[in-house]
């Protein structure tokens, strides 16, 4: 397992794209989890511009027909990349090559409704079963993941600079009282 700890704007999405491209070259499929439905259009657009029709979207706001189509395409191998929220961890891949969890410290990866599950725990088990890498990524990793990385359970990868050395945005605190 790997923990990619990168500052905001360091190019984590670009790393995901390169890793997934390598996975597809090996004839395997990939799952990319994002913490919220609102984040899917932007990242799906970026991946579709690179990988075209190989990308499917999976989240709870899809219609039954859209969900069924995405599942069938992943199951029969016509789609190679599933991008979605926590439920996408159950995508019916035949040959999983990598599973990536973006913003892994977000609490939205834990389902509070029945059936209760933690998508990251499911991801670990799927990667163990498929003998493939799990990449957890965040600018603010969970304490658990950071602890495992520091103890050597996870391999810690760090992106300490922003892409092209862009400066961080300037923040001003204003007292509204």
Name the predicted role of every residue range.
Residues 55-64, 106-117, 177:
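Flexible beta-alpha connector loops of hexameric P-loop NTPases
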Residues 9, 13, 98, 105-172:
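Post-DEXD/H (motif II) to motif III coupling segment of the RecA-like Helicase ATP-binding lobe
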Residues 85-86, 102-104:
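Walker B catalytic acidic pair
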Residues 24-25, 75, 127-128:
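Conserved ATPase "switch" residues in P-loop NTPase domains
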Residues 1-6, 31-33:
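Short hydrophobic/aromatic beta-strand immediately N-terminal to the Walker A/P-loop
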